Amino acid sequence: MNITIVSVGKLKEKYLKQGIDEYKKRLNAYAKVSIIEVADEKAPETMSEAEMKEVKRKEGERILSSIAPDAFVITLEIEGKMLGSEQLAKKLDELATYGKSKVVFVIGGSLGISQDVQRRSDLALSFSKMTFPHQLMRLVLIEQVYRSFRINRGEPYHK
């Protein structure tokens, strides 16, 4: 399976990079993993609704241009469906079973994701009703993907 994480903005925090690199290395035993960073749109501190929509639209175009047409797209959204680790593992297993070898996870920028990206999404996934920094979500997401593969192979993992 090919797992791609598309995320808005550059990861600057060294400790997050180290954690992500560790899980990416571990995941190589199960899947091909790539991380694509698309540029975030520079935005003023205070914006009108129209300006916010435009920022999301521009970031959305960059996100969409990095997604293969045949990929199964999972967007991370506060209002998405909440799944437990076992349920996410089952979903990834089902995708592999039904021939969906390309799975793309999308993490939007600080304003979220555009409606165009939401329309392209096959599954809107929520990790919590809380808001997290999108850089931190990369680490949380890649750990959960790793955990999913361990679960699907009957290997031990922390509950």
From Swiss-Prot:
<keyword id="KW-0808">Transferase</keyword>
<dbReference type="InterPro" id="IPR003742">
    <property type="entry name" value="RlmH-like"/>
</dbReference>
<keyword id="KW-0698">rRNA processing</keyword>
<dbReference type="InterPro" id="IPR029026">
    <property type="entry name" value="tRNA_m1G_MTases_N"/>
</dbReference>
<comment type="function">
    <text>Specifically methylates the pseudouridine at position 1915 (m3Psi1915) in 23S rRNA.</text>
</comment>
<keyword id="KW-0489">Methyltransferase</keyword>
<dbReference type="Pfam" id="PF02590">
    <property type="entry name" value="SPOUT_MTase"/>
</dbReference>
<feature type="binding site">
    <location>
        <position position="76"/>
    </location>
    <ligand>
        <name>S-adenosyl-L-methionine</name>
    </ligand>
</feature>
<keyword id="KW-0963">Cytoplasm</keyword>
<comment type="similarity">
    <text>Belongs to the RNA methyltransferase RlmH family.</text>
</comment>
<dbReference type="GO" id="GO:0005737">
    <property type="term" value="C:cytoplasm"/>
</dbReference>
<feature type="binding site">
    <location>
        <position position="108"/>
    </location>
    <ligand>
        <name>S-adenosyl-L-methionine</name>
    </ligand>
</feature>
<keyword id="KW-0949">S-adenosyl-L-methionine</keyword>
<dbReference type="GO" id="GO:0070038">
    <property type="term" value="F:rRNA (pseudouridine-N3-)-methyltransferase activity"/>
</dbReference>
<dbReference type="InterPro" id="IPR029028">
    <property type="entry name" value="Alpha/beta_knot_MTases"/>
</dbReference>
<comment type="subunit">
    <text>Homodimer.</text>
</comment>
<protein>
    <recommendedName>
        <fullName>Ribosomal RNA large subunit methyltransferase H</fullName>
        <ecNumber>2.1.1.177</ecNumber>
    </recommendedName>
</protein>
<feature type="binding site">
    <location>
        <begin position="127"/>
        <end position="132"/>
    </location>
    <ligand>
        <name>S-adenosyl-L-methionine</name>
    </ligand>
</feature>
